[in-house]
Amino acid sequence: MRMTAIISEYNPFHNGHLYQAKIARQETGADLIVAIMSGTFTQRGEPAFTDKWTRAQAAVASGEIDLVLELPFYFAVQRADRFALGGVTIAETIGAESLSFGSECGQLEPFIEAAAENQEATPRYQELMQEGLARGLSSATAASHAFREMTTTLDLTTPNNTLGYYYARAASTITLHTTKRIGSGYHDLSTGDIMSATAIRAYHATHHSLIGLPELTAETLRNAVFASFEPYYPFIRHRLLTTPLDDLMQFNGIDSSLAPRLIEGARKNETFDNFMTAVKTRRYTRTSLQRVLIYLLTSSKSSEFENIAFDRIDYVRPLAFNDNGRLALREIKQRIPVISTFEKHPWLIKESHVTAAYAVPLARYDRLEEHRRFAHFAGSVSK
């Protein structure tokens, strides 16, 4: 079967995602589309809009996604280059012939050229990075500014282009394909037929209804429990105010400069938004801080990440699939173990802890039993 992969979060799956999957299927000649989707927490360090099982089921219900595989926590809640490398590693390991991604650019050649230039290895890039860091910028912001100074063929200040660049850097055996993003941009909160996931979540927060989704996807999500960061803040605050300083610095991303700042912010602020306003700086951006807080919430220590190889995976885990996806899983099993039931794999044990950290603040105790969850089988889904 000719397989095209899409690295995704589907937070939630919306009309723009549906458009991308349709175009990817048409232009790559794919027999099936497999989504490699982050789980309960996202790349930007946010609790997913709803749990991974429901999001995966909603994607398959659209009729364009045949199989959803989980992007493990260690790959998912990461800066862009590691997120991309982890996703590409899975796509190539399962035998996908193509990797499709949305981009603001919409043309593949600039990504190939930028990746081949490898500007990150040049002295000029390193000089610009150091200048940015010296001005108090975060690593991600300093990198964005450096790329802006050096690159003329590709705008790497936009989120989808940035991920596309790192996909191109990571790709070894897979053919790349890009679809121009249509409709709202990532941070655009305007409403319409094709809205950003950010706008859909914001609209739901104020109107308590879902718009901008395919009909069958919306139906799947109708009775879901939706998350925001606010219910998690009391748990994060408790840990910040009760953990000794030296122990706090064992968590991934927390150093001697950040730890006191987090403690002071937690001591003085009763809401998550006020806490973030007090703590974030040019160096500590909201996104990087959110990832740190997720590491804290999930008890993820720096030592856990020391031996993570982002270019290697020894299992895949399906979250949802249809008849076409089931056929694909048979082929994938010839390449790599497919874990559909819970096993005592260290990463799956971690996933159970991560799922508990996601579920308890939402009082979703029915979602605690990760070891009893099976991939959702949708059967035949009409397109």
UniProtKB/Swiss-Prot annotation:
Annotated coiled-coil segments of the chain: none
GO MF annotation list: ATP binding; ligase activity, forming carbon-nitrogen bonds; tRNA binding
Biological processes per GO annotation: tRNA modification
Principal localisation: cytoplasm
SUPFAM superfamilies: Nucleotidylyl transferase
Keyword tags: ATP-binding, Cytoplasm, Ligase, Nucleotide-binding, RNA-binding, tRNA processing, tRNA-binding
Matching Gene3D superfamilies: HUPs
Record localization: Cytoplasm
EC number from the UniProt entry: 6.3.4.-
Top EC class of this enzyme: ligase
One Pfam entry name: HIGH_NTase1
Domain of life the protein comes from: Bacteria
Keyword field contains Metal-binding: no
Reactions accelerated catalytically: cytidine(34) in elongator tRNA(Met) + acetate + ATP = N(4)-acetylcytidine(34) in elongator tRNA(Met) + AMP + diphosphate
One CC-aspect GO term: cytoplasm
Ligand binding (ATP): 7-20, 102, 160, 181-182
InterPro entries on file: Rossmann-like_a/b/a_fold, tRNA(Met)_cyd_acetate_ligase
Family statement drawn from the similarity comment of this UniProt entry: Belongs to the TmcAL family.
Function summary: Catalyzes the formation of N(4)-acetylcytidine (ac(4)C) at the wobble position of elongator tRNA(Met), using acetate and ATP as substrates. First activates an acetate ion to form acetyladenylate (Ac-AMP) and then transfers the acetyl group to tRNA to form ac(4)C34.
UniProt xrefs under HAMAP family: TmcAL
Protein name: tRNA(Met) cytidine acetate ligase
